[in-house]
Amino acid sequence: MKNSIFKGGLLVVIISFMTACNQKKEVPAVMVDKEAIKTEIQAMENAFAESYNNGTTDAINYYAEDAVSFSNGKMPLEGKKAIHESMKTELLTFPKGAKIAFETQEIHPSNDGNMLVEIGGYKVTDSTGTKVNSGHFISLFEKKDGKYICIRDMGNSDMPMTKK
């Protein structure tokens, strides 16, 4: 009888040790600094606008090689090269002296900070500072090699449609 009690007690002790050793430790959550990310994304938008306004679209280091961009009245543009070619075409009809500016209004990073949705607006002003176009955009970024790069974006004008 004593032997059975001893074996039962030993079994309880072994099971207790096994369950205690198998408890999962809580992994601390990655802290994502939204303000720092928003500042980083706004700096990318500012660099994009500066290159666009200077007519140097090849200097725009914003899109991934396999990015897809969606715009009003166009088929989706697939790939960085197609997006840059479209920008070059747009610049041919971009008003002389006009400037585009982008504003990051919201960011929504993933819990680990490796993916990010940006919601923003844009405004085009002529040489006198008068607004000639404006709209909104949404962009999806992925972090590659420590830097965000746009993999998808979509934009639309909020100006009234002109009749053809």
What are these regions (language model features)?
Residues 1-32:
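Bacterial Sec-dependent N-terminal signal peptides
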Residues 21-62, 162-164:
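Short, low-complexity N-terminal intrinsically disordered segments enriched in polar/charged residues
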Residues 25-26, 134-161:
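Short beta-strand edge/turn micro-motifs at domain boundaries
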Residues 48, 59-60, 67, 79, ...:
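Hydrophobic pocket/interface hotspot
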Residues 63, 110-112, 144:
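Structural motif
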Residues 67-78, 91-97:
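A short gly/proline-enriched turn/hairpin at secondary-structure junctions
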Residues 88-127:
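Surface-exposed, charged secondary-structure patches
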